[in-house]
From Swiss-Prot:
InterPro entries from the UniProt entry: dUTPase, dUTPase-like, dUTPase-like_sf, dUTPase_trimeric
Domain of life of the organism encoding this protein: Eukaryota
Residue numbers binding dUMP: 79, 92, 95, 98, 103, 148, 153-154
The protein's name in its UniProt record: Deoxyuridine 5'-triphosphate nucleotidohydrolase
CDD domains registered for this protein in UniProt: trimeric_dUTPase
Quaternary structure and interacting proteins, as annotated: Homotrimer.
Catalyzed chemical reaction(s): dUTP + H2O = dUMP + diphosphate + H(+)
UniProt pathway annotation: Pyrimidine metabolism; dUMP biosynthesis; dUMP from dCTP (dUTP route): step 2/2
Cell membrane found in the keyword field: no
EC code(s) of this entry: 3.6.1.23
A GO BP annotation: dUTP catabolic process
PANTHER family with a match to the protein in the record: DEOXYURIDINE 5'-TRIPHOSPHATE NUCLEOTIDOHYDROLASE
Lineage: Eukaryota, Fungi, Dikarya, Ascomycota, Saccharomycotina
Keywords recorded for this protein, A-Z: Hydrolase, Magnesium, Metal-binding, Nucleotide metabolism
């Protein structure tokens, strides 16, 4: 690891409670909340795009962000797009040190192509707290047994 890499790794991020937004072009738009108590900030498409039926696409927002310290940004579906058009999001974690363009992966679960116009709300950005825990390797004996044990994937009930 070079000294430049080490200094970047040790870089201290500015302490803030603001979501900072850089508009990368005139097509970028500052995220907005649909209501005062909305959990997420609406993200806007910076381009016209088509998400094919049963397909996926990567949609540009032309923004970069800095999330508040102790959080990350999660790109989540908009409920109206999910219910009315079968549109969901994927691969949506934006780390606190990411400075590239925010892009949105959209999946179309419907039978019809989904048309996006420049300026359409396509997803929402939810800020979530994160715990950066130390990692400690343990022995099998230290792995406490629980009532559930190794049961997974529906093991706790049928419904």
């Amino acid at each position: 690891m070079t000294s430049e890499d080490q200094s970047l790794k040790k870089q201290k991020l500015e302490s803030t409670q603001s979501l900072k937004v850089y508009l990368r072009s005139p097509k970028g738009k500052v995220p907005t909340k649909g209501s005062a108590l909305a959990a997420g900030y609406d993200l806007y498409s910076a381009e016209a795009a088509t998400i094919p039926a049963h397909g996926q696409g990567l949609v540009s927002t032309d923004i970069s962000i800095i999330v508040p310290i102790g959080t990350y940004g999660r790109v989540a579906p908009r409920s109206g797009l999910a219910v009315k058009h079968g549109i969901s999001t994927g691969a949506g974690v934006i780390d606190a040190d990411y400075r590239g363009e925010v892009k949105v992966v959209l999946f179309n679960h419907s039978e019809k192509d989904f048309e996006i116009k420049e300026g359409d709300r396509i997803a929402q950005l939810v800020l979530e707290q994160i715990v950066n825990a130390d990692i400690k390797e343990i022995s099998l004996e230290e792995l406490d047994n629980t009532e559930r044990g190794e049961g997974g994937f529906g093991s706790t009930g049928k419904n």
